[in-house]
Amino acid sequence: MVIIQKSSFNKVILLLIFITTQFFSQEISGTVNDSQGNPLIGANVIIEGTNNGAAADLNGFFTIEFIPLDDFTISVSYIGFKTIKVTYSKNDPITNLQFTLIQGKLFGNEVIVLARKREETIKEVPISMVSIGKETIEDMGATSIEDLTAIVPNVFAYDDQTATGFNIRGITGGARNPGMATAEGVYLDGVIMGRPNFISSDIVDLQSVEFLRGPQGTLFGRNTVSGAINMITVKPSPVNSSAFLIEKGDFGYLKMKGSVNYRITDKIYGRFSGYSFDHDGYLTNTFDNSREKYKNNLGGRFAIRSVSTPKLTLDISYDFLQEDLKDISGHVSDWRISSRSSTFDGKPLDSIMIAIDSTVINDDGIYSYNLDSTGSTKRDLWGVTLNANYKLNENLNLISVFSYRSSLVVWSNDEDHTALDIMTGKWDNLGEQSTFEMRLVSDPNFQLSWLTGVFYYNLYERLIAPVYPKPLFFHIAAGIPMFLAEAQFAGATVEPEGKGNTVSVGAFVSADYTVSEKLTLTAGARYSLDRKHFKYRQDGIPSFGYVNVPSDSNGHLISGYFDSTKTWSAFTPSFNIKYSITPSINLFGTISKGYKSGGFNTDYVSSYESVATPFKPEYITNYELGIKGGNQSNTLFINGALFRMEYIDMQVSQFQDLFEGYSISNAGKATITGLELDFSLRLFNNSLTLIGGFGRNEAIFNEFHDGYFNGYWNEGEEYTDANGNGEYDDDEEFIDMDNDYSGEHISTFPKQSWSLMADFRMPINSKMMFVTQLRSDYIDEKLSQLSTDKDANLLRDDARTLVNGHFGIETESWGVFAWGENLMDTEYIIKQGVNGYLGFIEQLWGQPRLLGIRTTFKF
């Protein structure tokens, strides 16, 4: 009886607890939609710090039973969207809540850019540009700038083993010659990378990458005649977080990246990012059937942000890169060599060697080369940047950027690129750069907004690049009998050394004036002053075209250096007009001018005049008409432009001939016309994103006499036939003429290109998403190199289409993907050219199909 009574009592107590709980508990309910009002099926809604939560149903509706004892926070998340958190008190109404999630990556008109050194939406910027944000970079699985340029019309990057080259609107930047500046400006957090050796193309912890097409001479200044590439890193934040990526693929491919963000104090935050990249490569040296290390990179970045006062933000960063590689070479497509000997000139070297001593020097096809010695390359790069942003008042900010960068590249190489002991070489290139910029920026919300600033740049560079021609070189290249070559030229050396400073200062101003709600005018100007001081000497072999510098009246090398200083200045204005047809569609027009400073030939030189006479600055005027806009729902964005660029004194680096190597000269005039169009489109409730583009260029030398006089007779040059035999003989008088490329296409660019990326995402449940992406890009045929003694068709790269992609599963904290590059296994040429010493043609073929697995983690 007692037991029954206790049982009844317990039941009563449980019933009272249940009734009390139901009485005091509350139902949290509401809906989760995107910014267009579409329900987000499976969105995750949880009460932070508890196990209470729910997933949104087909209508985006959710309910949660919960007893609020104090303030509480609701977290709402969905794959591909920004998580939101809202805190409520226990007395707040918590039924019929409405949560609107924003896409994780800004899209279309919303994209924020720094193209004009202030934050604004991409639609408001009256120039032709593309911005790729952090989320898109991650979605693509992009690990290099080259990956990103595949979806940017009229911008191309060719990332070979040790460096990245760029071509924007048909203009290729720079040369290996330290006396020549680059044509495009590559910037990292507002700091110019003054030489290719300062650039790390591996993508690590980038917030966005902006591609500005056309000259940017007003705000970015010198050496941005083709455009600018603006890389912006992720800044430290007060939220502790970390992220890691591991990629494993064929051919010994292993890439690892990671970043950690830490809140040091309430007002000081720190961030560290690191990466490593190892790749055995896809090219085989048939000499010993080996694969040399194609990539072996280690890099990182430390950053600290201080917000000690509401008015002042300080960002300090240190980044570094270490490369330690084995040199590779290219497949020889045409063994015919250039020689002063009629016995060897125009004959294939492989056949010559079989005839001489039965030596086989051929490789095994396009993915192979044949070197008897393996060189190495080491690069140590580091830099530090200090960025300060001080709010003077509500309407004016003072911004300053200071930086220092240092790069040392040391390599040894098999210069002849064959299995023969013909020539070896070394390269020791040191670069040190310091920059400072200060600018005042007004509030952009006034009818007249403006910015103005000053800029200082100092670059020191030193290059020592000896080559060691062996007796076999003199035998083949000049026909000297082998026993004489061994007696006269054993231990021969050609050793150029160039060093010096480039100092540049500039002042700039730009202003926007809002004439009406629809019309805005922008005008700006910059004054630049460049001073180059170079010292040069070369221990040469005058009888073979490599002169001694400095030398006496007999051509003998003397002590000291050739010393030269030159100063150039330029005024580069710009004018823009922007007209809003609708709130989401703008027309724009641009007239802008670019300037690239002059310089000196400080590579191997064949005459005293070529080093003593600097090449001139180049100037470009850009005319541009474009449109930017999208639909009201912001699921479509289109950016298009027509352009015409007129060049004066375009600088061209080109191969001359066997004993002259590469030389820089000025084309008289060149004209580049074209168009570019890119779009972004979202379909099927944002589950499918399409990004594509089309570009076309027509680039012609209107007038180009390269000014190259080699000092000896070439086929086609006029001469006095003294003995009447109908052919030129030694010691007969001749007219040494330069080469005329007028009417020729500018090399290294494709006339036409297009790209398309399709990204499809489908929720598996409230926490997991299936992702698949395909990317395809097409490049038209192009001429690799201008040459004075080779048929242009031999140096023409065929058109190619590449298909890359990945698929996998991702959550808020991890992801697993299978990925592939060159899925169709297309055979294509990255670059080719004439061997600088023997004249045969080498080709570097692109990566064949590469498959791998990628894993990501976020904490």
Predicted regions and their residues:
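Periplasmic-side early beta-strands and strand-to-turn transitions of outer-membrane beta-barrels
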Residues: P238, E247, R263-K347, I354-I356, ...
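Short, acidic, small-residue-rich periplasmic hinge/interaction motif at the N-terminus
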Residues: N33-N38, A43-E48, S75-K82, N91-E138
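Short acidic/polar hinge/loop motifs at secondary-structure boundaries
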Residues: T63-E65, P153, N177, E184, ...
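Outer-membrane beta-barrel translocator/receptor signature
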Residues: T182-A183, R195, V204-R213, T218-G300, ...
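C-terminal beta-signal and adjacent terminal beta-strands/loops
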Residues: Y712-N714, N723, E727-D730, Y778-S787, ...
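Structural signature of Gram-negative outer-membrane beta-barrels, strongest in the C-terminal barrel
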Residues: I304-T309, L440-D443, S449, G453-Y457, ...
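Gram-negative outer-membrane beta-barrel transporters
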Residues: E517, F637-E646, S665-L786, T856-K858
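Membrane-embedded beta-barrel scaffold of Gram-negative outer-membrane proteins
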Residues: N387-K391, N397-S412, S580, N586-S592, ...
